[in-house]
Amino acid sequence: AVIASSSAIHGRFHYRYGGDWERCTRTQEITRDKNGKNGKYTVTERVRGWTDEDEIGLFVQVGAILRGESEITWGEPLYLSGVVTRNSPLWVSNPKQQIAYLGVKYWARLYCPEVILGVYSPDEV
């Protein structure tokens, strides 16, 4: 949001997705027993319904028009299989949205570091 509302870019971010993202749309519900300070309890969680192999070849490429330029500056493709830290449950329910967000963050660090000004999210610290 900081980048999009700054004058560093003209317009909005652009996205290119590659691969068959339909492979990563299934989720499943599991029930697990956990131990807490008050004893054992059961939790229900939503987990991904796809394998690591299903993620191979899936990527997003993020780009934007930098101030003073007329063409889109595209970042490098970001592959889903290469994303290790997935702290949000949205990685299970909406991986395309999450990888797009991560792609914008990487793009901004590379092409507009002056806008970020050293601000880091908790998973980057």
Stretch-by-stretch model annotation:
Residues A1-V125:
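Glycine-rich anion-binding surface patch
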